[in-house]
């Protein structure tokens, strides 16, 4: 961790604090709203937000419509059996775990890199339960 990096910490996980003589220096141009604009949760990093396209079964789609993943989320198509959503975010572990929570009810259509990540996680899950 470089001293110039922005870090976030979960206060509920802290067990001890130590007061130091050294003070943190917040860059004069730092804008928290801008920094976290493309993030889900508290995890953010310097990087390009990706266009994510999801296909959700009817029940999952209803939930995703009312409990959006992110403020950039848009409904692109709504059919009887599924809906297609688009959002632009930084792909984080928090987002991946959110998708995994939908099990087989949500499919990542784009980007291919995220599809591959979820495929690998699903294969690991199957392997764990086969033994």
Spans of features found by a protein language model:
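Polybasic (Lys/Arg-rich)
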Residues: 37-131
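Core beta-strand-centered patch of the WYL/Sm-like small regulatory domain
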Residues: 1-44, 49-53
């Amino acid at each position: 961790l470089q001293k110039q990096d922005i870090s976030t910490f979960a206060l509920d996980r802290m067990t001890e604090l130590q007061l130091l003589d050294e003070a943190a220096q917040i860059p004069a141009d730092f804008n928290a709203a801008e920094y976290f604009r493309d993030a889900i949760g508290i995890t953010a990093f310097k990087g390009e937000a990706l266009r994510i396209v999801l296909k959700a079964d009817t029940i999952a789609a209803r939930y995703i419509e009312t409990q959006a993943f992110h403020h950039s989320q848009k409904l692109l198509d709504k059919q009887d059996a599924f809906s297609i959503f688009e959002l632009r975010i930084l792909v984080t572990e928090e987002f991946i775990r959110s998708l995994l929570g939908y099990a087989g009810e949500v499919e990542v259509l784009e980007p291919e890199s995220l599809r591959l990540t979820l495929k690998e996680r699903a294969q690991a899950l199957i392997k764990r339960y086969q033994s």
